[in-house]
Every structure is written in C-alpha cells, then in structure tokens.
C-alpha cells in the first residue's frame, strides 16, 4: 500500500508563501491578475461564482471545496493575513472578467474610502444595478478593506475600471440617460423621469463629481432632505438614490 504524504506549508520563508503575501500589494495583484480573500463567507461567495483559484486552510481544518487546496500552519496564516485576528480559511481568486455593460449602470468618480466603495457595491447589488464603472482615480477594487466591506457582493456584479471621459460619451451614444449627483441643484431624485437605460454618477467624498464630468451628463439630481443637514456620506447617499431608481 502506497503511503500518501500530505504537504503542509509551515515556513514563511517558502517562496510560494512569500508570493501569496505579495498579493496584499496592488502592483503584484495587477501583475498576477489575482487577489486574496479572507474568511469562510468570502471564500464561499468566490467559489459559487467560479472565481476561487486556491483554497488556503489551517492544518487539520475539515473545511473543503472542490478546488486546489493548500494546508498551512497558523504562523503562515498570520503572516499572510491583513487582519489583527487571522482567519483559518483564506483564498486566492482570479480578478473579475469584464462583461458587457448592462442597462442599469452606476459610475463612481474618485471614491477613495475602501469602506465606502464596499458598501456602495453591496447597495448596487441590493437594488439591481447591472454594472459598476469605477473611474481610474477610485480606490483599488481589490484592496483588502474594500473586499471585506462588500461582504462578497463584488462577486455578484459586473465591475469595470475605465477612463470616465471616454466611457460616458460612449454610453450617451448608446442612448443611456446620464444622471449625476449635484449638491448645487438639479431635480429631486423622487421626481425624475426614469429610463430603461441609465447611468448614475456619484463623486468623491469631499469634492463630489468633477465639473468636467458633470458637463457630460444629461441631468443633475439631488436628495431632498432636512435643511439642517448639509450633506450625506457618499455610501449612504448612493444607497438612497439606488433605492429610488429601483422603485
């Protein structure tokens, strides 16, 4: 009878482990077309959506999926993880493939906070947005804080990174109605005429949407609210807008 020897990675000096650790850096993620996820929930979401390349589990963990699997010791997980309390399950994922743009589009101009981007992605899935287009100056989609904030919803929606000055005119030529959030005026989101094909543009946390981007839009919109409140967090505002558009 042949003895099967199970490989368990225990050294943080191992080249394979070092290369996995490098996926915490954007430059290496872009080079490899891969990114890291941490925790069982995210791993299961990635697996369900055919994005999981490799499962990484702590030795003697009974969790299993039909995918390439690495068993590692706790010190290796702690070395790889970005969390204070490392998870016992991690994964290496393929970066998302860009799909055809759907009829309901959310465009983000310069959103910088990882938590905001993650929350916006969750809201977009909740309110049936087909496609999210990130401007090139947005925070990296595969930033670990963004990924955790999405709670796995990044695997359930088409997300592209584009030059907005090139992409918005293309959408206009395809008969999308281009709407933009604008603190300086426009139409109440509750009163606008809805189109089957639309793109809504939301801007940076501090500066809002760039003026040159606003000039590319068909209509400015705002959320009517108590005059004592000057503004809302971008993730909160986006959630309200997407809810109204989904009615």
Question: Where does each model-flagged region fall?
Answer:
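Structured adenosyl-cofactor binding patch, chiefly the S-adenosyl-L-methionine
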Residues: 126-127, 146-154, 211-247
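Active-site regions of enzymes building and remodeling cell-envelope glycoconjugates
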Residues: 64-76, 103-104, 196-199, 218
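Short beta->alpha connector loops at strand-helix junctions that form conserved
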Residues: 72-73, 109, 135-136, 158, ...
């Amino acid at each position: 009878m042949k003895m099967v020897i199970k490989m368990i990675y225990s050294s943080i000096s191992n080249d394979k482990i070092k290369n996995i650790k490098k996926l915490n850096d954007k430059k290496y993620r872009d080079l490899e077309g891969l990114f890291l996820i941490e925790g069982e929930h995210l791993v299961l979401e990635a697996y369900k959506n055919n994005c999981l390349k490799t499962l990484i589990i702590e030795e003697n963990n009974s969790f299993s999926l039909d995918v390439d699997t690495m068993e590692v010791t706790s010190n290796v997980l702690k070395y790889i993880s970005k969390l204070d309390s490392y998870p016992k399950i991690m994964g290496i994922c393929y970066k998302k493939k860009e799909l055809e743009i759907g009829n309901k589009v959310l465009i983000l101009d310069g959103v910088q906070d990882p938590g905001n981007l993650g929350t916006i992605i969750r809201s977009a899935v909740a309110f049936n947005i087909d496609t999210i287009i990130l401007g090139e100056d947005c925070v990296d989609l595969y930033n670990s804080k963004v990924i955790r904030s999405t709670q796995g919803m990044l695997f359930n929606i088409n997300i592209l990174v584009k030059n907005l000055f090139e992409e918005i005119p293309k959408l206009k030529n395809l008969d999308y109605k281009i709407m933009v959030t604008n603190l300086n005026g426009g139409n109440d989101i509750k009163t606008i005429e809805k189109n089957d094909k639309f793109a809504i543009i939301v801007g940076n946390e501090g500066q809002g949407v760039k003026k040159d981007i606003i000039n590319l839009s068909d209509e400015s919109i705002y959320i009517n609210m108590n005059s004592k409140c000057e503004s809302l967090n971008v993730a909160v505002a986006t959630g309200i807008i997407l809810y109204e558009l989904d009615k």
